Amino acid sequence: MLEILRIPGIAYRKVGENSKSNYALAAWAQKARLDSRTILTSPVNIDKLSSVLSDIRALTLEDPESFCPKLRQLLGECGIAIVFLPHISGSFLHGATFIEGNHIVIGLTVRGRDADRFWFSLFHELCHVIDGHIFNQDFTDDPEREAAADRFARDILIPVADYNAFIQTDCRSKEAIITFAKKIGIAPGIVVGRLQKENIIPYEWYHDLKVGYTISS
């Protein structure tokens, strides 16, 4: 189906699927592919990528104008070209990862994206790189590997032990969330997003803590 079927090992995160979404994914991935060809990177180095994950995580505390150049540099030194693309209506797509030439491409949808979803999607895609999923020619959206990538993203953003201890406290107050986020060195909106996802607080709460990103594609 379209060009997407000629991108071996593509791994992607999306929240639904239909025939329209598959064609949208194909168009989106082709745009990411073409944009990545203008980006210079070092040779692929997975060990280096693993070593800079904490540096990437620390960027959650910065705004896009500040963190985007740093993120591009960190990933470029690991052989990864990151491209930011607008959301395509009907695609359900958050991000995708694949090999193009001599480097790895990570594409993320960014227009109007909440910070918590942006960083979750990024670390989800980085898991596909670190765990070698994209080097499997037959891999696309294997459910078990997608679930593993979700767990990786969740737990690197908010470590398991810290989170489990936090939710045993009065974790629903804004003050508690801000204090906890500062303690673990993460943006408070990411903590809010996690608590909302797990139905610990309503989705209507604390929108002032959730930053929306607009990043030029």
Where in this protein do the model-derived segments appear?
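Active-site hotspot residues in diverse enzymes, especially metal/ion-binding acidic/histidine motifs
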Residues: M1-S217
